[in-house]
From Swiss-Prot:
Its EC number is 2.7.7.8. One of its GO terms (cellular component) is cytosol. It is found in: Cytoplasm. CDD domains: KH-I_PNPase, RNase_PH_PNPase_1, RNase_PH_PNPase_2. Its main location: cytoplasm. The gene is pnp. SUPFAM superfamilies: Eukaryotic type KH-domain (KH-domain type I), Nucleic acid-binding proteins, Polynucleotide phosphorylase/guanosine pentaphosphate synthase (PNPase/GPSI), domain 3, Ribonuclease PH domain 2-like, Ribosomal protein S5 domain 2-like. Residues 556-615 form the KH domain. This is Polyribonucleotide nucleotidyltransferase. One of its GO terms (biological process) is RNA processing. It comes from the Bacteria. GO terms for molecular function: 3'-5'-RNA exonuclease activity; magnesium ion binding; polyribonucleotide nucleotidyltransferase activity; RNA binding. Keywords: Cytoplasm, Magnesium, Metal-binding, Nucleotidyltransferase, RNA-binding, Transferase.
Length: 693
């Protein structure tokens, strides 16, 4: 068993790549270690293409094992279940990073599995998994010539931090992940505290220059340990077939792409596809030599060439816009009467109905990870039903990876403006229902989430808007597109989503399909995105600029009281008897803490006010010189104990009763008396006198 190792430094941390010791039956197997963190990444490449395959079946699975952190899983079975959302997001991040490095037309199935074997909690293992995925591919024999790498960058006190640990990330205004090759940026994912575009671009370029060290180490490992290159075929468009279709149908295809409506355009294009298939299969020019798949691929290639050339030649885009024009926007809030907050955001043929629901601390999401169980006060869920694109399909199933990814992007975009628990004690859940989609539904979700929260009275720091940018590039000619359509995303070279406030960027996601994206192009894309974002914010601000001062009448009410910590036991009572009684009588939820905080959560104001008054009565302090209506709770030989407030009793001597002209033998337990607090000694003992009738 021969083991090969490569060692390099990244951000003052030593990282070790090793192959040959584990999982040797996989085509590629690499362990990536940093301190006590170890990730095993395997790659398996199928040597033949599945019959009828017309896409690249790459799958990436990032898995965390609880034993890596010295823990036993929860649940009845005490074993790991399906991957968490965080694991799915890391799988997507790795997939998006490596997918562009494969040649077009390569359809062999590849499966990558990254397994966290050891974890010390100092930093997320996601970058180790990404580096390991690239290394295992490089030695697997797959056609993976453009080796990629990825790094995380933070930004604190005006300085970029390479490969920050978790403590550094907590203080950072930026969490940026960049992956790419030696000479190209391929993927960017980030969250930021409203940072200027110049800082975001600087972070991307700073990250890219540090990829070379990792790529060199992976290349060295591949040179000494790589398997022979597999034999494979590349699917290519039949040029003769493409020429045939173009000569007969190009004019009609061209006319179809002047129809601005997506539905009408698709009807025309589907009709053309049928006509093309009929023409090819009934013509005398060897039509039977071609499959339906080949014909439709050639047709699609003509569409792609047409859309791209039109844009590069300065002609109108598919829907008639120029490169910088934003589609018409319509904003409505409060569209659903029975919810806590709602907004309907429509941009062209993309529409998101976004609903905000307020809850108590008990509604917070509990997220289990290698770090333990964490509580999330802010949840955002994204649903993409098939009717949003005019299709039939599965409904009511678990969210797909794409839905989880879009929800996460929208959450990260609005996280920077979400209030902390001290300022806003509610738990918030946002649901985005995509009702129509023709590009950039995730950015519509960002805009709708901001509007919906303001409608619900959530005190967000600033409104947030998002926009998706695109790129068409051919040699030195290029065009940056604002607010891209679905077809422009599919046929273009870049998907660049930017969200932020009027002050700066809060989230960024970029996927680039080609090499050669210069700094000049990135600067233009950032500037166009900023202009577009401010335009969208302006329209949103015309409808609602700041959060509503109060929550909806149908929304729950929260009140927080800070009382003497010694009184908490009185609020709770023996075995929780007192607090249970308040809950049963008012219907409110009551949470207490040893610090003296009492949090009341009620379905309406009446319930809240009643619970509040009951708690206030329990925790109220008696004062000297004040008169109280009390009740005798115990009779002694020399006097009576009278309950004043909650659990506070005072002692009433018989001499005081007689002095007030009342006979002591007439007193019974449970009898009401009006008493005056004469004094309270240092021990807290209360002496009373009877108020004469």
């Amino acid at each position: 068993m021969k083991i090969f190792r490569e060692v390099f430094e990244l951000g003052n941390k030593e990282i070790v790549l090793e192959t040959g010791g584990m999982a040797r039956q996989a085509d590629g197997s690499v362990t990536v270690s940093c301190g006590n963190n170890v990730v095993l990444v395997t790659t398996v490449v199928k040597k033949s293409v599945a019959a009828g395959a017309d896409f690249f079946p790459l799958s990436v699975h990032y898995l965390e094992k609880t034993y890596a952190a010295g823990k036993i899983p929860g649940g009845f079975l005490r074993r790991e279940g399906r991957p968490s959302e965080e694991q799915i997001l890391i799988s997507r991040l790795i997939d998006r990073s490596i997918r562009p490095s494969f040649p077009d037309g390569f359809f062999n199935e590849i499966q990558i599995v990254a397994t966290v074997l050891s974890y010390d909690g100092s930093f997320s293992p996601d970058m180790l998994a990404l580096i390991g995925a690239s290394a295992s591919l490089a030695i697997s024999g797959a056609p993976y010539d453009d080796i990629i790498a990825g790094v995380r960058v933070g930004y604190t006190n005006g300085k970029y931090i390479l490969n920050p640990n978790k403590e550094e990330l907590k203080e950072s205004d930026l969490d940026l992940v960049v992956s790419g090759t030696d000479d190209a940026i391929l993927m960017v994912e980030s969250e930021a505290n409203s940072l200027p575009e110049s800082v975001m671009l600087g972070g991307i370029l700073y990250a890219h220059k540090h990829l070379k060290t990792i790529i060199n180490s992976i290349s060295k490992l591949a040179k000494v340990s790589s398997k022979p290159r597999i034999e494979y075929t590349i699917y290519q468009i039949n040029k003769l077939l493409k020429s045939q279709i173009k000569s007969h149908f190009f004019g009609e295809i061209k006319n179809a792409y002047t129809i601005p409506s997506k539905q009408e355009r698709n009807i025309k294009l589907n009709e053309l596809r049928k006509n093309v298939l009929e023409h090819i299969f009934t013509s005398d020019v060897d039509g039977n030599e071609y499959s339906e798949k080949e014909v439709l691929e050639a047709f699609h290639d003509i569409e792609k060439d047409l859309v791209r050339s039109n844009i590069l030649e300065g002609k109108p885009r598919i829907d008639g816009r120029c490169t910088e024009t934003i589609r018409p926007i319509n904003v409505k809030i409060g569209v659903l009467p029975g919810v806590h907050g709602s907004a309907l955001f429509t941009r062209g043929e993309t529409q998101a109905l976004v609903v905000t629901t307020l809850g108590s601390d008990r509604d917070a999401q509990l997220v289990e990870s290698l770090d333990g169980i964490e509580k999330s006060r802010y949840m955002l869920h994204y649903n993409f039903p098939p009717y949003s694109v005019g299709e039939c399909g599965m409904v009511g199933m678990a969210p797909k990876r794409r839905e989880i990814g879009h929800a996460n992007l929208a959450k990260r975009a609005t996280q920077a403006v979400f209030p902390n628990e001290e300022a806003y004690p509610y738990v918030v859940r946002i649901v985005s229902e995509i009702l129509e989609s023709n590009g950039s539904s995730s950015m519509a979700t960002v805009c709708g989430s901001s509007l919906s929260m303001m409608d619900a009275g959530v005190p967000i720091a600033e409104p947030v808007a998002g926009i998706a940018m695109g790129l068409i590039k051919d040699g030195a000619k290029y065009a940056v597109l604002s607010d891209i359509l679905g077809d422009e995303d599919h046929l273009g070279d870049m998907d660049f989503k930017v969200a932020g406030t009027r002050y700066g960027v809060t989230a960024l996601q970029m996927d680039i399909k080609i090499k050669g994206i210069s700094r000049e192009i990135l600067e233009q894309a950032f500037e166009q995105a900023r202009t577009g974002r401010l335009h969208i914010l302006g329209i949103m601000n015309e409808v609602i600029r700041e959060h509503k001062e109060s929550v909806s009448d149908v929304a729950p009410q929260i009140h927080i009281m800070n009382v003497n910590p010694a009184k908490i036991k009185d609020v709770v009572g023996r075995g929780g008897s007192v607090v249970k009684g308040i809950v049963e009588k008012t219907g409110a939820q009551i949470d207490t803490s040893d610090s003296g905080e009492v949090k009341i959560f009620a379905k309406d104001k009446r319930s809240l006010d009643l619970a509040k008054s009951m708690v206030e009565e329990i925790v109220a302090e008696v004062e000297e010189g004040q008169i109280y209506k009390g009740k005798i709770v115990k009779l002694l030989d020399s006097g009576a104990f009278v309950n004043l407030l909650g659990s506070q009793d005072g002692y009433l001597p018989f001499s005081e009763i007689e002095q007030a002209g009342m006979k002591t033998n007439s007193l019974v337990e449970g009898q009401g008396l009006e008493v005056l607090v004469q004094n309270i000694d240092r021990g807290g003992r209360v002496k009373l006198s009877l108020v004469a009738r």
